[in-house]
Amino acid sequence: MPDNKIITDREEMLETVKKDGTGFALMNASDTLKADREVVLEAVKNNGAALQYADEALQADRELVIEAVRENGYALKSASDSLKADREVVLEAVKNWGSALQFASDTLKSDREVVLEAVKDNDIKGALQFASDTLKADRELVLEALKGSYAAFEFADDTLKADREVVLEAVKISGMALVWTSDTLKDDREVVIEAVKMYVNAYKNSTSGERSAAIRRLLKYASKELQNDPELKKLAKD
């Protein structure tokens, strides 16, 4: 973290932001320098998050904001409302960090191309949670989201969680999709077997003990009847 000294010298500030990789240096600039386009541009090129300290007018500067979100998608949070509704700006942001979708306008959260780009990002829970309800019910998009985030199925529409065909595809991509599947399909032997097969493959380079433990954890989400299925219990032991 930088110290609390306010920098008023333009050349000193330019040198400081060029060397700073944290995005915090601009915080110590004078108000005049926070409104200096060249200073702010240098700052966001190094770390887009510096946009949060820029003058409000520069947070609405389209070219500058694009530079910022290309470097750090999180910078979209600090962009003006008009730029949060700008398709190109938001696309650049979600290409860098899918979950930047949370800062986009509602209209763009309903834009299929924008959301498809966002869900491609590997993130723990992924960007699907920020998509419109309509797109959470989009089969192709949800399956694409699962490729980037094993937990994405949590945010899928309930109709998809109860759709056998969709769930079979989902558990083949990520066995963990079983966690959020409808109770009816947790009692579907083929669905559970496909989820287990995915785990067997995912843990093929692990020890047999690690693989068995992972499968046992997964089977806790199957129906009670299938948890006691001899074939599935054998897979968990092998």
Regions found by a protein language model. Give the residues of each.
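Non-catalytic tandem-repeat scaffold regions and their flanking low-complexity/translocation tails
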Residues: 1-238
